[in-house]
Amino acid sequence: MPIGESYVGSAHPIAVQSMTNTSTLQTEASVEQICRIAAAGGDIVRLTAQGRAEAENLRNIVAAVRERGLHTAIVADVHFVAEIASISAQYVDKVRINPGNYRLSGGAFEALIAQCRERGVSLRVGVNHGSLAKRIFDEWGDTPEGMVASAMEFLRICQRERFDDVVVSMKSSNTRVMVHAYRLLVEAMEREAMTYPLHLGVTEAGNGIEGRVKSAVGIGALLADGIGDTIRVSLTEAPENEIPVARKIVDYFASREGEFHVEHPERYSPTAFVRRSCVQTPIIHSELSDDFVVMESTSANPTAELRARLLDTPAEQAVVVKRRYDDSELEDVALKAACDLGVLFLDGLADGIWIDAPALSDEQIKDLELMILQASRVRFSHTEYIACPSCGRTLYDIEQTLAQIKARTSHLRNLKIGIMGCIVNGPGEMADADYGYVGAAAGRITLYKGREVVERNIPQEEALEHLIALIKANGDWIEK
């Protein structure tokens, strides 16, 4: 399907994309950032359109980008208001709407489809785990099944209207939820003869190596299954930093070859987490004992090879999966290992991890193994930060704030802390966090304990101290 002058789906290469974090009212700043993303190799760039003024200014941004000779596809990100989607569709190549806050009643979605068809604009039905509609939540809860139900309502309308230029996404900050949601969606679409392209991404992955590992675990699990037509690696960093990471992941899967026979396919459940063995807490290689056997892959398709061998291994045998990486850079080893091995833990198949990387120190390998286990949701060993990458809706410097919060709280190993730019997806995406720090207005922060608001409209310069005081008041603080 076309997105401007780009194509996604079928045999077309996997497209990589990012999202600006400038205000969409700031034309020059937004254009400059789009140019940097394009220069880094981005195929698609998304901008937030939270109001009429932002939607109307997309005209100026797109015109300025085209004047510079760039043909990068431009996407409007719309929440809540159908009118804003309609305005945006006049100027951009694609409109993303969120089924969780877009009304189906009244024919607004059909009207948007008609407008997009007339202009040659594509749509993205972008489901977020953290912002399911109340009626969906009441019936399904915040589950992968609920995410699929939300998407299918809109896809059925697209199918009925014979509108095919649609991309679908099922994003979550929880890698297991995200992977199961996409797999369930593929099954649901196949049952109803739908073949819409899929956009992959893990929301609120964070920054640094941890953010890259978390994205690679989720995205890699699906690419290993042959699922995915576009991807975004969401990082709480400059948007252009996302593109080289996404390219590395895409390129890593482009050269995979090899099929492996499975004697016991009935042992595999792709849409439910079932432990293969009785080992409850997977180990890292320095914890290896005689109770485990080591299963090493040397093939060009390590995920498929190890998954096949694990499925044919008796449940009473605990297995540590091993892979050697000769790369010299930590990021390259981290991305490859997360892509190769993370899914084996997401699916409950492996019992331990061994990364053989001669260029890395023992401490780096240990940290990386623990990061992959944590990103795969099977062993938590350090503070987890659910941090959004920010966009034009963010009203504070989230990258700097994340660094400050990490500096003060990274020793609190059993906690999950959400750092969110705004309330659109923030409270929902960090629903399983112990504490939350969410932008409420310019220079103002709201603090959460679990899902409950405990303090509103705190001046940003005071918010970190208030967060620490809240953690202490609930008995979760440990002195360094």
Set out the residue ranges of the language-model regions.
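Non-cysteine beta-strand/loop elements that form the S-adenosyl-L-methionine
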Residues: 95-98, 121-130, 198
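Conserved, mostly hydrophobic/aromatic
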Residues: 16, 77, 125, 168, ...
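Catalytic domains of carbohydrate-active enzymes, especially glycoside hydrolases
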Residues: 32-48, 91, 286-293
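Active-site mouth loops of central-metabolism enzymes
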Residues: 11-29, 48, 73-80, 100, ...
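Catalytic alpha/beta core domains of metabolic enzymes, predominantly
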Residues: 128, 136-273, 290-419
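Glycine-rich, proline-tolerant flexible connector loops at the mouths of alpha/beta enzymes
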Residues: 21, 39-65, 99-104, 166-175, ...
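N-terminal amphipathic alpha-helix/helix-capping segment at the start of soluble metabolic enzymes
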Residues: 1-19, 117, 255-286, 403, ...
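Alpha-helix-loop-beta-strand connector modules within alpha/beta enzyme cores
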Residues: 52-76, 112-121, 185-194, 255, ...
